[in-house]
């Protein structure tokens, strides 16, 4: 239900210390079709180990992914965390990064629908990994090699991913951008206005929270240019944004513990957040 809405609480607390006063809410990826386990609790536990209060937002997927449902679920999670913390950041991956950035750019709308004040649901910062921030880029015909190759394993895919399969001369491939848009819009042929409403790079303003973005050039599911789109949108509005593009690494790395190049990103994000808190205190 949406209106002055009744939204199910989906904030799973991992660590809550009343003396800490700062929290990170993690939004796993999964193309709005599922929630990736290794992009949720493991990430929250890393930041908990760095002294943060942490939680995971288990937002709606598949038929429950239609906006503004997940947007309001994350907004409610931020509002809950805000009662217990002075600084609240959101951290998302892939579709979760899209969702986190959407709240950063649509928090006033979310507050209105929840019947609360914008400052209650506005994150103080966002940490975003390999997300989609401008959907029209994924809606134009693309070369087959743009999509992530499934290498003949399409029969092993979860059913929720099969709508994204594209037959190519090289084999079955996944178009994650199109799949995310379909689930978030709730239909296969969203209008131009719906494209824009789901594209944070089109919605950024001077009050959009600062962001730390990271991605890899080898990502075949979501082009690395997507992160540049959002960073440029923030820079154009005078909003601080850090963009880290690693040369190697696949989509969906999470903590990237097996990647010798990008596994530093969590420490980098932690340092960036502490510096941001220092400038705001």
Describe the predicted segments one by one.
Residues 1-281:
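Alpha/beta-hydrolase superfamily serine-hydrolase fold, recognizing
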């Amino acid at each position: 239900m949406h209106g002055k809405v009744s939204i199910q609480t989906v904030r799973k607390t991992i660590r809550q210390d009343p003396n800490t006063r700062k929290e990170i809410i993690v939004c796993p990826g999964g193309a709005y079709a599922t929630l990736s386990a290794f992009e949720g609790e493991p990430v929250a536990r890393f930041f908990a180990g760095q002294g943060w209060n942490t939680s995971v937002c288990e937002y709606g997927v598949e038929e429950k992914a239609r906006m503004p449902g997940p947007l309001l679920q994350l907004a409610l999670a931020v509002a809950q965390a805000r009662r217990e913390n002075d600084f609240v950041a959101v951290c998302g991956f892939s579709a979760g990064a899209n969702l986190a950035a959407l709240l950063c750019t649509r928090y006033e709308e979310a507050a209105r629908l929840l019947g609360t004040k914008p400052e209650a649901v506005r994150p103080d910062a966002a940490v975003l990994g390999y997300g989609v921030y401008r959907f029209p880029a994924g809606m134009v015909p693309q070369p087959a090699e743009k999509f992530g190759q499934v290498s003949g394993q399409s029969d092993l895919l979860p059913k929720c991913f099969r709508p994204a399969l594209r037959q190519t001369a090289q084999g079955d491939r996944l178009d994650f951008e199109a799949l995310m848009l379909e689930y978030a819009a709730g239909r296969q042929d969203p209008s131009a206005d719906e494209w824009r409403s789901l594209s944070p790079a089109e919605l950024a303003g001077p009050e959009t929270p600062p962001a730390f973005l990271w991605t890899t050039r080898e990502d075949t599911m979501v082009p690395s240019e997507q992160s540049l789109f959002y960073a440029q949108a923030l820079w154009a509005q005078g909003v601080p944004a850090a963009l880290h593009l690693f040369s190697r690494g696949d989509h969906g790395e999470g903590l990237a513990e097996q990647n010798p190049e990008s596994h530093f990103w969590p420490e980098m994000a932690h340092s960036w957040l502490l510096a941001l808190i220092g400038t705001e205190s």
